[in-house]
Each structure stands twice: as structure tokens, then as C-alpha cells.
């Protein structure tokens, strides 16, 4: 005769094992790191052309240079030897696009956000200040562009990658901006142009 307690105990062990396996599998698939607060924001699958990848890229710029091609919705980090690391980005909406040459002036993890007065005038419902964290529109990291109000930053809206939606900043999913943040030092040259170099 089967011992009921032993059978129930065995079922609990099997159920716990399955739960741990599923949880571990989900965490690996979602690429959830050990860093507190850096949650996976890739709950939506980015289109293949918006996913981080190494690509062929001809340029005369030095390795380490960032080139942003706004019409393509891509940010390139020049690697040299005709290659670049490409990230999908969200860019400025109509009336908020720009081109130029700047340098990364500073970097911040989980940056606070204070919308500039011009943005408050256009969108008076915005908060006047928001502390850094998962709900902050700047996301997990920010790389500040010169003395401007523009940044390369994460987002709390990964569904906007590949679109023209911002007020002139460039947004990446949090996993990508954290990767970029670790690769790029302050002082890095950033070129913003309509199209990539051909």
C-alpha cells in the first residue's frame, strides 16, 4: 500500500523542482541580472533590426566613436575594421530632431529626471521631478550630451524603440543602455546625423 504522506511529499518535491526550473529558465530568458533594480524591459520582442548586433559599417571615424543615424533609428559604436556595434533606438519626433557633433559630458546610473521648462510648457501634466528608478522615463542609465538637455538614455517604454517619439533624446531598452554605458567613457565623440556614413 502506498504511503499517502510519502506520495504527497514526493509531489511537493517535484512541484518545487518544476517551479525553480521554470523560474530559473524565465530569469535566463529575460536576461535579469543580479543588479538590484535592473529589471528586464524586453518583455516585448524587439524587431530583429532593432536588436543589438555587430554589423558591417564603413566609416573614417575612430573606434569608440558613437554615430547616431536618426532616419534609421540606430546608434552605432565604431569598432574598427569595417565593423560597428549597432543598437536600436527611439529618436526625436517631428520638430525635435537635430544633427551635430558633441561629446559625452557625464554618465549617471538610475538618473533623476527634471523636465526642462519648455517640456513642462508643452506637457503641463508632467511631474516637476522624478527620482531615478524603474518607472523613470530615463531608464537605467543616461549618457549626457555636452551642455545640452539631450541624452542617450534607457526607457520605461521599450515599445517606443524604433519610433520617433522623444523630445530630442535617444532612448534604448535598459539592457542595451546598460551595455553601452559600460563600454563608453566620458569624453566619447558623438555624431548625430540624418543618415549613416556610406
Predicted features by range, described:
Residues 2-198:
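N-terminal pre-domains immediately preceding structured catalytic cores
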Amino acid at each position: 500500500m502506498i504511503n499517502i504522506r510519502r506520495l504527497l511529499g514526493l509531489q511537493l518535491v517535484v512541484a518545487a523542482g518544476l517551479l525553480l526550473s521554470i523560474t530559473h529558465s524565465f530569469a535566463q530568458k529575460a536576461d535579469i541580472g543580479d543588479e538590484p533594480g535592473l529589471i528586464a524591459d524586453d518583455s516585448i520582442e524587439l524587431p530583429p533590426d532593432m536588436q543589438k548586433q555587430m554589423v558591417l559599417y564603413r566609416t573614417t571615424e575612430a573606434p569608440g566613436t558613437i554615430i547616431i543615424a536618426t532616419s534609421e533609428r540606430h546608434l552605432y559604436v565604431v569598432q574598427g575594421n569595417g565593423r560597428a556595434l549597432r543598437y536600436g533606438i527611439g529618436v526625436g519626433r517631428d520638430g525635435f530632431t537635430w544633427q551635430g557633433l558633441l561629446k559625452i559630458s557625464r554618465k549617471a546610473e538610475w538618473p533623476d529626471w527634471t523636465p526642462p521648462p519648455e517640456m513642462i510648457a508643452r506637457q503641463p501634466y508632467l511631474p516637476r521631478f522624478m527620482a531615478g528608478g524603474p518607472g523613470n522615463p530615463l531608464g537605467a542609465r543616461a549618457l549626457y550630451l555636452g551642455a545640452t538637455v539631450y541624452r542617450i538614455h534607457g526607457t520605461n517604454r521599450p515599445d517606443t524603440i524604433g519610433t520617433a517619439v522623444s523630445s530630442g533624446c535617444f532612448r534604448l531598452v535598459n539592457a542595451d543602455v546598460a551595455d553601452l554605458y559600460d563600454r563608453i567613457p566620458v569624453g566619447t565623440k558623438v555624431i548625430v546625423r540624418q543618415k549613416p556614413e556610406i
